[in-house]
Amino acid sequence: MIPLIPLAAVAAGAITTTYTVAIAREAKRPRRATYAWALAHHSAASPAEVPGVRTWHEGSTVLHTMGHTPAAHHTPAAHSTSPAHATPPSARSIVLPWWLVEGQGAGAMLLIHGWGRSRWDSLRRLPWLLEHAASIVVPDLRGHGEAPGTTSIGHSDHLDLDQVIQRADNASASGATNGGLTIVGHSMGAMVAARLAALLAARGTPARRLVLMAPYDSLIVPMANRLRVRGLPTGPFAASAAWWLARDEEPVHRTLARVQCPVLALGGGLDAVTTPDDVRRAAAPHETLIEPGIDHANVGVEGTASREALHAFLSRT
């Protein structure tokens, strides 16, 4: 019987390692929400199907390493009058596709989707935002939607989006930057939004305002909560995977201390991925509204109180 003890320990270790690696791998390679996802979920398949959208363009940004100027590709559709321009990407290029939607307000806005989602999911949040910006950039993050590569799980996406907003603004005919930049993010996108706002503040060009929908403070929060929702064990596994993927992660509440702009956080009372306590912890000490009856996927999509709070915040800032 004694030889069985080390054998059992080896087997337990192998199972633990395999499970932890599987958690990390899923986090890095989520299922993609593309055009087919939108059709399957009876969601808008393009900005043209969103009520209130009048004009929109489709484009993409070829990402370059720091110190290089990103190239933009503008793809005129039948509804677009802007010319195509840019240098063709190479086989090794990472190209982030985006939509540029003309709104009825002032300033520019960046709308960032969450983990495992895409710009198609962002279209669900567009109706609440159209009257508060002259132009809204709706991108796919790396490793999501139609963007190639693997996701950084929110840890370096702000660097990609820094390039995207520079190029998308050049494609806008609205002069949107005159009214400042509003950054809106959902779930993982909220983490990206906070980091981008901090980056812009450090550069001396702070964002006008920041909206965080279902934010979380660190990667362990959604990673562990998603396992619980699926009835899978969390134990030390989620913590180990999160440490592996985000060893140098700064909590979002610390990042927010550097953003230098008004912040609003929205959460849902039925959210099991980023619970109300998780939202408050991430956004403290900023204005936070938790609306009962709203789950994670529908924060920023449903809820009268949430919509009124968002409208009031965007109107006064």
Annotate each PLM feature.
Residues 195-248, 255:
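Hydrolase active-site cap/lid region
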Residues 258-259, 265-267, 271:
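Short beta-strand/loop motif that positions the catalytic acidic residue
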Residues 129-148:
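Conserved alpha/beta-hydrolase
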Residues 151-172:
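Alpha/beta-hydrolase active-site loop
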Residues 115-128, 141:
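The serine-hydrolase catalytic nucleophile loop
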Residues 294-307:
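Catalytic histidine-centered segment of alpha/beta-hydrolase-like enzymes
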Residues 272-278, 299:
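Conserved alpha/beta-hydrolase "acid-adjacent" motif
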Residues 2-67, 71, 77-78, 82-86:
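An N-terminal hydrophobic leader/cap segment in hydrolases
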